[in-house]
Amino acid sequence: MSEKNNSYDEDDKEEDFFQNKNTSEIKDEIIPLKEEEESEKEKEKEKKKLSSDSKNNSENKNFLKKKHKLESKEKEKELVSYKDYYTFGYRDPGKEGRKASRIIFLRSFNNWVKASIINKYCRLLGRGASVLELCCGKGGDLDKYFMNQIKLFVGADIARESLVNAMERLKKIKNEKYNNNLKIKCIFIKDDLSSPQNHFLEKINKKYYFDLVSCQFALHYHFENEKRINAFLKNASERLCDGGYFIGSIIEDNVIIKRLRNRKNILDNKYINEKLTFGNEYYSVKFFQKHFNTSNGPYGIKYGFYLEDSIDNRDDTGNINYVEEYLVVFKEFVELCKKYDLYLVEKKNFTKFYEDYIKNDQFKILSNKMLKDLDNPSIEKQWEIIQLYMVFVFRKGKDNNNNDKARYKPYLEKNNIILNNFEPEFNDETFV
């Protein structure tokens, strides 16, 4: 491990975490991230133009292409931008709401997978590890890290409201489980983690490095184009220690494509949107076109995803509004990671993960605690959703197998919470 990765000082001040205070400052109001959309008037104008083109030149090679593009945009009216959804659309149902959920088994299983993978690699790293969670959302995994005796947690997300919820969750955890004696430094940062113009790590003091980087159920939002996924991977790897791990969970590309192809009439030459949809009463996946231009790489393969409770968008008539996601072509992702000195060490579908990890007593005990009614026939349709997902683990450095615990120096015992310069009412609390 290089010298720069070890340069922590217990006398550091909290404000020293940020490289430049001004760069981390945000306004109190939330400014929506606007998506470029055609107005209804522009769409009508385009329709008339296409109609005219058809009459004047029926052999126009671009006519059909333009027509399908316009039709696709019309059909995508029911698609919600993930940025808008997590900024404005999502409402946490709360603990009681989650308990009453019809997909409580799915939620529990996903939490078991995350708890197991976090537990395994935190133990490999040793006590006092530092964690960077990208797309941390409402902080649902905070306690999973705390139970592994980490010393530093930094959570970053695009949605301010989610981060405020994460800070509230942190306050509750430390009060109820740790009797106000949680000696872990926690920092939250609002930023677009895949913006090519904005590398949020440049805002953080260069002496801060991380032993574990995590991105759970969110990587698919960043596969929109090559620039965005590269910007994201730069953020994931740039401050990851040599020998550290990058862990995550995503929808598996092979599974989603196989299910799409198994749909009846999917090869029908007619463009019928409903034939690009699959799912059950709990979830739905919807593609908006059959063919994608991948001449510049397998990026931007957009689909809509709906999951009851978690992504619960319906219009006034009860029709589903899907949240946009992008297919992560994993083979391409592995090659991209190599550019950032990240090398694959583990990849498993959730069902295979369960089959393998349940053989270990440590994870079996965790399973007995977190998973109930495994043989209940009523959860069969939730297993169908579970099979969509996979976990991945990359290690920084191709031949680096050194996990010497002595290299991890304890961080500050003081625990402050920062959302850039936005301070919640409980931010003044310190812990001795």
Each language-model region and where it sits:
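Class I SAM-dependent methyltransferase Rossmann-like catalytic core
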Residues: 72-125
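A short acidic, Gly/Pro-enriched loop at the edge of an enzyme's catalytic core
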Residues: 199-213
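Conserved beta-strand signature within the Rossmann-like core of class I S-adenosyl-L-methionine
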Residues: 242-251
